[in-house]
Amino acid sequence: MAIERTFSMIKPDATKRNLTGAITKVFEDNGLRIVASKRVWMSKREAEGFYAVHKERPFFGELVEGMTSGPTIVQVLEGENAILKNREIMGATNPAQAAEGTIRKSFALSIGENSVHGSDAPETAAQEIAYWFAETEIVG
């Protein structure tokens, strides 16, 4: 098994409900180490840039609005097969379809307010990490 890094985000719907610690605990309890973390309030430009891949999707405006509505925790997680493990821990995008014990089943309010984001592939992880962090900010 390979030690890898992935990008993780705790979204405003969760931070506004003071769930940062509870969600962080789930990552750590499942063997993922937080090697970089910061609290940001995304600007419209940052949200549009980060989610540019969804620009033509009908939910893009709502997504940007939600992501700029409050503080967000951006993180780099490290561990064995971190990308897959994080995706399993998060659960399905739609919390109604997420497995019991996953972050989204436990904390998400809806498909639009699903509490967390995580990279889906090594290339995406590298891009998303670089969007928010300089290499010197990742210590682990």
Swiss-Prot record:
Main location: cytoplasm
Cellular location(s): Cytoplasm
UniProt-listed Enzyme Commission number(s): 2.7.4.6
Binding-site list for ATP: K11, F59, R87, T93, R104, N114
Pfam families in UniProt: NDK
Flavoprotein as UniProt keyword: no
InterPro entries in the record: NDK-like_dom, NDK-like_dom_sf, Nucleoside_diP_kinase, Nucleoside_diP_kinase_AS
Cofactor: Mg(2+)
GO biological process: CTP biosynthetic process; GTP biosynthetic process; UTP biosynthetic process
Keyword entries, A-Z: ATP-binding, Cytoplasm, Kinase, Magnesium, Metal-binding, Nucleotide metabolism, Nucleotide-binding, Phosphoprotein, Transferase
GO terms of molecular function: ATP binding; metal ion binding; nucleoside diphosphate kinase activity
Coiled-coil portions: none
Top-rank taxon, per record: Bacteria
Entry annotated with the keyword Transferase: yes
A cellular-component GO term for this protein: cytoplasm
Annotated active site: H117
PROSITE patterns: NDPK, NDPK_LIKE
Physiological role: Major role in the synthesis of nucleoside triphosphates other than ATP. The ATP gamma phosphate is transferred to the NDP beta phosphate via a ping-pong mechanism, using a phosphorylated active-site intermediate.
Subunit structure: Homotetramer.
The protein's name: Nucleoside diphosphate kinase
Organism: Agrobacterium fabrum (strain C58 / ATCC 33970)
